[in-house]
């Protein structure tokens, strides 16, 4: 990058070289990602400052990186990824207070979601979508609280708590050709009312805080992996039904 300090040719000072090096370092840091993104330097008018040049360079890198990252995230969400991209996760990724969406299906709050899907995705009527999701969301566990390694199930007015330890993940291939990852946790000590295994699926494949998730639970680890018709779904308890509906339509 050539910098014109005046109309007459001059000799770059050591200080100018240091400023230049700082500008280049700033740009490369902002553009760091799995996919290398390049951007060209923009010629500046002599009245503009070095700082403005650096900011422009950084913004361009950040924009390109964000766009590439969003595309990759969307592909992963849809179930298209490489095995090498899958990483282990901690239970803390699902930490929080969660509510089942099943009651919102029952009271009609999610009807707008099914109408939206019918109109934009096709294949089923709104009523057919509702019936499909009714089977998927159905559960008697209306709330789940996860704190550190402890999971508490709220079922029929009663609470059941136990500690769970990480038991690896399984990559599943669905009939449609896309894939998903189940993150599995095992009950550390047998306790009344608690499943031996819980399996999370949230469309992510590496450490990240979940915004919602599908949960499978039972005492047979392998049998749970075959369950693809019933997937109780949980969103943060602080969200109301309409917020959840709009979040669903955004995906």
UniProtKB/Swiss-Prot annotation:
Question: Which Pfam families would you find in this protein's record?
Answer: ZinT
Q: Which UniProt keywords apply?
A: Metal-binding, Signal, Zinc
Q: Where does Zn(2+) 1 bind?
A: 203, 212, 214
Q: Does the keyword Signal apply?
A: yes
Q: Which residues bind Zn(2+) 2?
A: 212, 247, 251
Region Disordered: list its residue ranges: 25-72
Composition bias of kind Polar residues appears in 25-41
Signal peptide residue numbers: 1-30
Is the Zinc keyword given for this protein? yes
Molecular function (GO) terms listed?
Answer: zinc ion binding
Q: Where in the sequence does UniProt note compositional bias of the Basic and acidic residues kind?
A: 54-72
What does the sequence similarity comment in the record state about its family? Belongs to the calycin superfamily. ZinT family.
In its UniProt entry, what is this protein called?
A: Probable metal-binding protein YrpE
Q: Which gene encodes it?
A: yrpE
């Amino acid at each position: 990058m050539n910098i014109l300090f005046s109309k007459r040719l001059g000799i770059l000072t050591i200080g100018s070289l240091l400023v230049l090096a700082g500008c280049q370092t700033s740009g490369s840091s902002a553009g760091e990602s799995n996919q290398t993104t390049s951007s060209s330097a923009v010629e500046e008018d002599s009245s503009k400052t070095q700082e403005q040049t650096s900011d422009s360079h950084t913004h361009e890198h950040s924009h390109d990186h964000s766009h590439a990252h969003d595309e990759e995230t969307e592909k992963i969400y849809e179930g298209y990824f490489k095995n090498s991209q899958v990483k282990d996760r901690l239970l803390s990724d699902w930490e929080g207070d969660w509510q089942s969406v099943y009651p919102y299906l029952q009271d009609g709050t999610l009807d707008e979601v099914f109408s939206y899907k019918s109109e934009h995705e096709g294949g089923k009527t709104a009523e057919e979508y509702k019936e499909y999701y009714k089977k998927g969301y159905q559960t008697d566990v209306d709330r789940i609280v996860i704190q550190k390694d402890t999971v508490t199930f709220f079922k029929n007015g009663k609470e059941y708590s136990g500690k769970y330890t990480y038991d690896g993940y399984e990559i599943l291939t669905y009939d449609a050709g896309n894939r998903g990852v189940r993150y599995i946790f095992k009950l550390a000590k047998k306790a009344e009312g608690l499943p031996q295994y819980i399996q999370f699926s949230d469309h992510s494949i590496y450490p990240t805080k979940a915004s919602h998730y599908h949960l499978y639970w039972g005492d047979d680890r392998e049998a749970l992996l075959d369950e693809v018709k019933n997937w109780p779904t949980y969103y943060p308890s602080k969200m109301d039904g309409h917020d959840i509906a709009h979040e669903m339509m955004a995906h």
